[in-house]
Each structure stands twice: as structure tokens, then as C-alpha cells.
Amino acid sequence: MSDLKAAALRALKLMDLTTLNDNDTDEAVIALCKNAKTAVGNTAAVCIYPRFIPIAKKTLREQGTPEVRIATVTNFPHGNDDIEIAVAETKAAVAYGADEVDVVFPYRALIAGDETTGFELVKQCKEACGDVLLKVIIETGELKEEALIKKASQICIEAGANFIKTSTGKVPVNATPEYARMMLEVIRDMDVAKTVGFKPAGGVRTAEDAQAYLAMADDILGGDWADNMHYRFGASSLLTNLLNTLEVTEETADPSAY
């Protein structure tokens, strides 16, 4: 297997296959869940709006892939600084049955010099999550500066985040390798690689992109770090590209073909 194919297979199993469109329907979410099951393995998770959690859970169970995790979003996409609302949304997501919650950090508050709101929001959302995984979206493309990106990452980690995530995918600039490096360096420098993961989201579209991101993680945190409890790709169109790279066609995907 070529290096690119090996990276594509690895990336596929680290994907949070995502649909977060305003016009999402039950049908779109059912289709997403079906796509999470491929001939070469399942994606790590699907990522959907909270109201679709019950239909996703049912679909994943009925197709025999209950191990695919369900991630959802809160305080999304604007990262407002109302802690009470963010916590209420997070509690509701957990009650719906989410396995993972991706909450948006109040990044504008941090830009304005307020570090406390972000810390409290993440801390209280983590308390609301209990054992449910909390990923915190810092919106790198809006923070822009290395000092702010690193500060946001540190605050999230200190407040109990299980993952730090680049972006909502709803702003002009989302994940970039440069931003990813800054965030991975914080995980390394704070010595929290065992307990904190990383998720680039938005802009990771090809097997080559995924290969470069994984190579960076291997370089900074070691070759065995980026497993599915420490690394995820937030993406939608990436899956098709990975399957094409792996030369998986509809025929190979048909179980009756075996």
C-alpha cells in the first residue's frame, strides 16, 4: 500500500463525518450515517445538529455500526459569551444522547482581552458533559494571531477540554497547517498529549491534505499519538476523496460482492 493510501485509510477512521447545514433534514442525516460505514472501515463519528441525534442513533444501530460516535455542536457557530446558554445547550445535547459535544469558545471575548469568560464557559460545559467528550472550537481564522491561538488553546485545556478544534467551518478561514502546528505545540508544551486531542475542521479536502496534517502530528507528538481518541478530522467532502484514493468503488462497497 502506498504512503498516500495508508494515510487515506488512517484519516478515514479519524473522520467526524459532518453535516451542519441550515437546511439539513432527517434524510440528509440518514444518508450521512450510511456514508459513515464504508468497505474499508467506519468513520470515527458523525457530527450533526442536536435535533438529529435520535435519528442518527437509530440509523447507526439499524445498519450495524453503533460504535460510530455521535458528535454535535453547541454555542454554534458564533461563539457567544453567554455561559448560561452554552451550558444549557450542552446539557440538552447530552440528554439527547450525544457521545461528544463540539462547543464554540467565546473567541471575540478573548480578542477583547477577556480570558475569564472562556475559561468558565469551557469548565461549566465540561461539567455538564460528564463522561461525554468535549471538543472546544477556538475559531483560529478569527483569532488569527499566534499569541491568541495559543492562549485560547491553553485556556481550553486548563478548563478541562478533551479536544481543541480549529474551526466551525462557518467563517472565511478555517483549518490551516500553520494554525494546526500552533495548537499541537500547545498540547506538547503543556505535556497533555495523553489527555487532550486535536481536531482540524474545514478546509481538509484531500488525502494529500490529511496526509500532511497527520505527518505534522506524528512529528510533534509521536507516531502513535494520533488515534481516534486524540485526533479527528472535521470534514464532509474529504470522505469521497479518501475513498477515491483507496480505489473503493460502489461495487467493492457492496457486501454481497464478498
Curated annotation (Swiss-Prot):
Name of the encoding gene: deoC
Primary localisation category: cytoplasm
Pfam families on file: DeoC
Alphabetized UniProt keyword annotations: Cytoplasm, Lyase, Schiff base
Cellular-component GO terms for this entry: cytoplasm
Function: Catalyzes a reversible aldol reaction between acetaldehyde and D-glyceraldehyde 3-phosphate to generate 2-deoxy-D-ribose 5-phosphate.
Gene Ontology molecular functions: deoxyribose-phosphate aldolase activity
EC number assigned by the record: 4.1.2.4
Active site location: D102, K165, K199
GO biological process terms held by the UniProt record: 2-deoxyribose 1-phosphate catabolic process; carbohydrate catabolic process; deoxyribonucleotide catabolic process
Protein name: Deoxyribose-phosphate aldolase
NCBIfam families named in the record: deoC
Catalytic activity: 2-deoxy-D-ribose 5-phosphate = D-glyceraldehyde 3-phosphate + acetaldehyde
Pathway linked to the protein: Carbohydrate degradation; 2-deoxy-D-ribose 1-phosphate degradation; D-glyceraldehyde 3-phosphate and acetaldehyde from 2-deoxy-alpha-D-ribose 1-phosphate: step 2/2
SUPFAM superfamilies in UniProt: Aldolase
InterPro entries: Aldolase_TIM, DeoC, DeoC/FbaB/LacD_aldolase, DeoC_typeII
Subcellular location: Cytoplasm
Lineage: Bacteria, Pseudomonadati, Pseudomonadota, Gammaproteobacteria, Vibrionales
PANTHER family: DEOXYRIBOSE-PHOSPHATE ALDOLASE
Family membership: Belongs to the DeoC/FbaB aldolase family. DeoC type 2 subfamily.
